[in-house]
């Protein structure tokens, strides 16, 4: 199943909230993303059907291995671009918003090359 940027955002949010809270419910995702609970329910159903997450009997959300892999990939890109943009002098709020857009459209090859170039600059 091909994910849209919004699906990737939900997975990334669940990952971040799991790191912060431990256990995550749909209401936590809705609050964090500032979206309605019905929007989260629809996204959760789509992601569950796609094999990216599960929901237990207590309504806690759990990323599957595939879901975690996607979430970690997006989160890594988000952090990288946010840091790079801030280092280049971009306002943190703008850097965060721009990173959120870039993380979804950049190819794996381009991201890998940028990471390598940034690492070489730090050496």
Placement of each model-derived feature along the sequence:
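C-terminal regulatory/oligomerization modules of transcriptional regulators
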Residues: 97-123
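A generic alpha-helix surface/boundary motif
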Residues: 78-80, 96
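Helix N-cap / loop-to-helix initiation motif
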Residues: 36, 89-93
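Basic, amphipathic "hinge/linker" alpha-helix immediately C-terminal to the N-terminal HTH DNA-binding motif
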Residues: 59-77
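Residue-level signal for threonine
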Residues: 4, 63-64, 107
């Amino acid at each position: 199943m091909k994910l849209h940027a919004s699906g990737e955002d939900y997975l990334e949010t669940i990952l971040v909230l799991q790191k912060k809270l431990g256990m995550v419910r749909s209401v936590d995702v809705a609050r964090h993303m500032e979206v309605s609970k019905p929007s989260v329910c629809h996204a959760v159903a789509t992601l569950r059907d796609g094999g990216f997450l599960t929901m237990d009997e207590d309504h806690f959300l759990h990323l599957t291995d595939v879901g975690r892999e996607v979430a970690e990939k997006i989160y890594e890109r988000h952090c990288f671009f946010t840091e790079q943009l801030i280092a280049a002098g971009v306002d943190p709020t703008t850097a965060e918003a721009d990173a959120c857009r870039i993380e979804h459209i950049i190819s794996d090859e381009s991201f890998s090359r940028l990471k390598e170039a940034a690492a070489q600059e730090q050496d």
